C-alpha cells in the first residue's frame, strides 16, 4: 500500500473538521476532540509532504 497523498490527507482533514463541528453542536465533545486530533495529524502529514517536495526541488 502506498503512502497517502496530499489530496487524500486534505480531504481527511476536512472530513474530520466537519464531523467535529457537528459533534460539538450535538454535545459530543469527547468524540469531537478525537476528530480534531485526527485533523491535526492529517494536516501535519500534509506539511511533511510539502516540506519534502520543497527539498526535492532544490
Predicted regions located by residue number:
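Short, charge/polar-rich alpha-helical segments
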Residues: 1-7
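Short, charge-rich amphipathic interface segments used for partner binding and complex assembly
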Residues: 7, 11-58
Amino acid at each position: 500500500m502506498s503512502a497517502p497523498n496530499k489530496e487524500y490527507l486534505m480531504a481527511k482533514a476536512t472530513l474530520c473538521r466537519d464531523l467535529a463541528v457537528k459533534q460539538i453542536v450535538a454535545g459530543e465533545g469527547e468524540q469531537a476532540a478525537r476528530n480534531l486530533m485526527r485533523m491535526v495529524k492529517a494536516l501535519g502529514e500534509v506539511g511533511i509532504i510539502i516540506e519534502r517536495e520543497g527539498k526535492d526541488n532544490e
